[in-house]
Structure formats: C-alpha cells, structure tokens
C-alpha cells in the first residue's frame, strides 16, 4: 500500500472514530443467529464504499467477528473477505469483473475441499435514515457521503442479515458461475427492501398529496354532494376539503425524528430502568420480505405513541404513520406529533361524508404506498388495565384498501405495551369513581411531565402476525371476487365484510393478550390484591410469586409472551424499590402491604396479566370448592365455562388446545405440591399448598361474581335484552358491594359490564354447547358458577330478585 493510500485510510479511520456511532441490527445478532465466528466468513455489501467497509470493520471487531479487511486464508491461499454487489454486472461475453473473479475463486476453493463451508454474511451500512422518493437515486458521491456522515454519523446502523451457507448454494445450483448473477439480483432486492424497511418511503409534499387526493373520483363526488347538501359554492366545498386534509395529514420530518430520538433516549435512560423488547425479529423479517406492516397495539398511556416509535427506530425499522385522536392536536404537541408521523382522526365520522371520504382516501394512500401504519384498535386508553372492546372502523378501512389494490401484502402486527408505572393511572381511578375526564391541553402536558420519575421498566412485545391475505383465504375463500379497480367511487362493502372485521378484531385482541409481559409490579399486585387484607409476609409473598412464575414458565409454552427470568427475591426487591408497597417491620417476618389508597391503582397493573392466570385460578377454585373432584369433572366444568371467559378475556386456546392446556396446568399444580392426586381425584395439599392455592383462586373471585350476576339474571329473565341486562347487572353489583362492604368502584363500573355484555351477546352462539339448547346451556353454566362462589352471595342475589319481584307485583296492583 502506498504512503498516499495509508494516509487516506488513516484519515478515514480517524473520521469514523470521531463522527460515526453505529448501532447493530439485530442487537444480539451473533448469539441469536448461532453464527460461529471462528468459521470462514465472507462479507457482501450493497455498494462500493470504503467508509462503509471501515464502519463494518469496527462493528465486526466489537462483535468478535473476523476483520473484513484481513484476507481469508484457506490452504495457504489468501482471498479478500468482502465483496460489493454493485461490482457484479452480467458480462454478456465480455471479460468478467474482479467481483466475479473473486467469487469464482471461492467456488474453486470448494471444488478442492468439499468439506469447507464458507459462511456468506450480507451486511448493509446505513448512515442517516432520511426517507427518499421511490424514484430517487440512493447512490451518492464521495463528497456527499462525507457531509452525510459528518451531519448524520451519530445516527448510523449496521444491518447483519441471516448468514448463508456457500456449500448449500453450490449443492443446490452446481458450480455454474451464472449463479453469481442470480445471487447478485437476489441480494440487490434484499438490500433494497432492507433499506425501505429501515428508512421508509417519503410521502409527497402536502401540496402534491392534496392535489392527488382532490383529483380522485371519490373525493370529487363527495365535493359535489357537499356543495349540493350544504348549498355552498364548489370553491367553498373545495376549501373545506383542503382544511380537512390539513387537519388529518401527517407532516413527517426526519430532523424532528432524529431530535426526538435524542430527547427520548435521554428520557428513557433517566426515568425508566430499562425498555424490554420481545419478538422484534419476526417483524423485521416480514418487513424485509416486502410486507406492508400495520402495527395494532393495545392502548395504556399517551406514552404508547412515543415508546413504540422509539423501539421501532432502534430495531432498525421505519417509524410508522400513527392514527392519533384529534384531542391530541393541541399546541404545541399537535405540531410535534404530526412531524413524528401522527395523522389525526376524529372520534366520530357520522354525518360528515366529506370527512370520511377524505380520511379513507388518505388511509388508502398510506396502505397502497407501502408505508408502515399504526392505530389503536381499542379506540382509547384503557382505564382499567383490561383490553377494551375493539373498535372496527379503521380495521374495516384496512381491508377495504386491500380490496381496491391487492398488490401490497398487508400484515397486522398485534403489539402488547406494558409498564410498571403508568403516569395517568391516578386520573384513570378518578374517572372510574365518576369524575369527568379532563381535556388534554398544554398545561396538562406540563403537569404530566412533572410525574416522570420512578417509572420502572417498559415492555414492548410483538405478538403473532396476521397476514391479511392468508386470513381471508382461510375465513372467506371467495374474497377475491370482491376486488375491484381502485378508481371506483363507492367504498367496497361486500356482504361478508362486517362479520369478518369483527372476527378479525377479536383475533387481534387475542394475539395482543397472548403477548403479555409479566413483571414485578403486576405479579406483586396480583398476589397482594388476592390476599386477605391486601397483606402478606415476605415468605408468603415470595412463595406466591414463585407459584405464578412456575405456572407461566412451565405450562403451557407461549413464545410471544415474556416472563422475567429473575428470581422471586429479585422481583420483590425491585417492586419494593418502586415505592408502591409498604413494608411493616414490626412483625416476626417483614409484612408487605398495599396501602388503602394504592388498592385501586394496583388493580390496573393486576388487570394487565389477569387473563394469563384465568385457567390456573379456575382449577384452584374448583378444587377448593369441591374438596375432592376428579380430573375429568374439572375439565368438564371448565370446558363449559371456557367460551364465556374466552369472549371477555380474549383467551388464546381453541377448544382442542384447551384440553392439553388444562392437563399441563393441573400437572404443574401437582408438581408445586399445591394439590394432590389421590385415586384420580384432586384434593388440596393441606401440608404445604393450602394458602398458595387460596390466593391463586382468590384472583378470579370478582370475575366469578360478575359472571354469576349476569347468568343468574339470564336464568330468571330468559328474554332480557342487552341494555336491560347491563342495567340490572350494575344495580345488583352495586347492591352486593354495599352488603359485602366492597369499596371498589370498578366492581360495578359501566365499562366492566358494557364491554362484557356486548361481547357476550355478539358471540352468544359460540357459548352454546352441542349437548344443550341456549337456555339450558346458560342454566348449566350458572349451576357451575354457583358451586364456585359463596352461598351467601347466591342468597343475596335470590333475595334481591325476590324483593324486586314483590315490588313490581305491588306496583302493578296499585297501578291497576
């Protein structure tokens, strides 16, 4: 190497050291991929760049991988360890390029030694992530590269793709050199998709986008209808449409995203003790394959918008366009959110055809353009910590967009977002007690920022993806008959759409719940809320935490949820550090208590994971209430109850999977010595498992009471409608709350019964057993529930019903 070259490389090394700070994608690539760093590794990169090569060298050495600038030595032969794909061009009879010659040398090595297995490692280096137009050339000259690295070098990523075995390629395609060209074509497509999945496409500027939308047939017709119905001029209708487009459309700014990355990075590090991400690689692979990704997260907090975008950015994925409620479009948050990708949606479209047409057209533009999109299927934030009944409007538009343009392969990604501390939880409990929701504004935002401390850990779990085309193929085999050209005016509303959207929304909710994150706060809250007087000694609480952890780790397996790998002692110490519990030391053992004022708040965190413990809690309750019961009878009773619980709690198991899950859970409770199996009958293990089993069972006490109220009323009023049933259920729950001295406003809150009853009535036919009529099935379910709740509660319900019946009889007589 000449002195001039040495000076150039040394200068480049120094520049990279000072100005480049790269992040590895995926974060734990070497361990997750199972790559053997001692094996011969050959790097391929998209395009010729010495700077990219040096950045790759720095990252490779950090990860313990071979230096790409050190030649590969095999049988005393030295060959360069890297190749640029853009150097491979089909020669068509001309002399082969140096890249082709290099690849042929690798083929020659294999022909001499067939046991040699060289690993091809595709790598792309990305400096900055400014979205580009699809027709824009990504190649830049050296000077442009220098200034890009100088300005954006701290925002660099090194993407390692899945390793490829050279021997497998040769065995599959022989040693024909033409395979080089095929590999180059495949690699170019892969690198381009990887680039798009990380950076995303740039939306047209507002003026061009609005012009395109206004020229569509659907909006032109809506403008004519607007002018005619409101008796205004076409120009006025046109101005109204522009105003609505400006209200809706996002205005993504890469510089704002880059700045927010710095601010959010500082905030997460200062106020959170860690952000845990699970199953992101599945999403990344789908994006690399060209899928149009739609993120469908649960909604716990306003922090969800920021957290998910931040996580995606750090996972090397393009930040999505986010459907945000119009209530967040206040100064200055609205403008910031808009630049971060938010587009704003009104709560209600009814009566405003122009708005709904424009919003649908804007959403179509996002879907057909392949932009990642995010919307909250619950519509609003959950005040109880439970998943809300899904809102299906935007989901329906997603399917309709695909029916207008089948080309994008849309995949829905359910996302579970969890926190150890939700900053709005205090206001949620106030709203449950009847206080009015405060309107979001600048001063409320400042007040919220003041609460940013001791936030614990955050969790983002990506659930099982749902590929729309595959889902429709399975559930609506003839759906392709409903596809029509994109320039048609009317929205596509095939006869199957409404029912399919409802079922799909329900499946999304199941997949969100199935990806739950288990942490110290929700586990400790679950145990203490289920205990007598909301207090346990330290050994008792540790025993209960261990029971929960073992149940979730051993039976049944779930690849989408995340269970902490910490020991119960570590979990408890962390939970106590969060200052949500009180430790009483004037006791033989430390006593951990929930202060009275914390009880409503802790219900929120308990509710986040309660669905994961429904089945083991049902088993525990059944064993405790029946004292001596066969495995078959436990399975029979829970199988009858399961459809009712599945509906509201969005439980994952099908009827076929349920039997296996129940057997695994029962075996686990035997292994933990909570129950004993005597002559094929289950009894409580009085010597060691009584208290653990009682607390486990107590976790669903309120749920069983809710269901008992509903099914009691369904047995005495067979023809009752949904609205009346909700009213009567709430009244009876309130009455029981007073008699049983239960202070929880959540027990009889309208949101509990409203969502539950809506889903029950929608899925009523799925509750019916093959052996029973609908009413007989309801009576059988109530008979099982009667055996699982206190006889005192049954007496109170019957007495309440008798008094009401007498009152109605008396009222009728006096009226007559």
Swiss-Prot record:
InterPro entries with a match to the protein in the record: GPAT/DHAPAT, GPAT/DHAPAT_C, GPAT/DHAPAT_LPLAT, GPAT_PlsB, Plipid/glycerol_acylTrfase
Location (main, coarse): membrane
Pathways per UniProt: Phospholipid metabolism; CDP-diacylglycerol biosynthesis; CDP-diacylglycerol from sn-glycerol 3-phosphate: step 1/3
Alphabetically ordered keywords of this record: Acyltransferase, Cell membrane, Lipid biosynthesis, Lipid metabolism, Membrane, Phospholipid biosynthesis, Phospholipid metabolism, Transferase
Domain observations: The HXXXXD motif is essential for acyltransferase activity and may constitute the binding site for the phosphate moiety of the glycerol-3-phosphate.
GO BP field: CDP-diacylglycerol biosynthetic process; fatty acid metabolic process
Location of this chain's protein in the cell: Cell membrane
Lineage: Bacteria, Pseudomonadati, Pseudomonadota, Gammaproteobacteria, Enterobacterales
Cellular component GO terms, alphabetical: plasma membrane
Similarity field: Belongs to the GPAT/DAPAT family.
EC nos: 2.3.1.15
Positions of short motif HXXXXD motif: 298-303
Reactions accelerated catalytically: sn-glycerol 3-phosphate + an acyl-CoA = a 1-acyl-sn-glycero-3-phosphate + CoA
GO molecular function terms noted in the UniProt entry: glycerol-3-phosphate O-acyltransferase activity
Pfam families, alphabetized: Acyltransferase, GPAT_C
SUPFAM superfamilies per record: Glycerol-3-phosphate (1)-acyltransferase
Protein name stated in the entry: Glycerol-3-phosphate acyltransferase
Recorded topology in the membrane: Peripheral membrane protein
Species name: Hamiltonella defensa subsp. Acyrthosiphon pisum (strain 5AT)
Top EC group: transferase
Source superkingdom: Bacteria
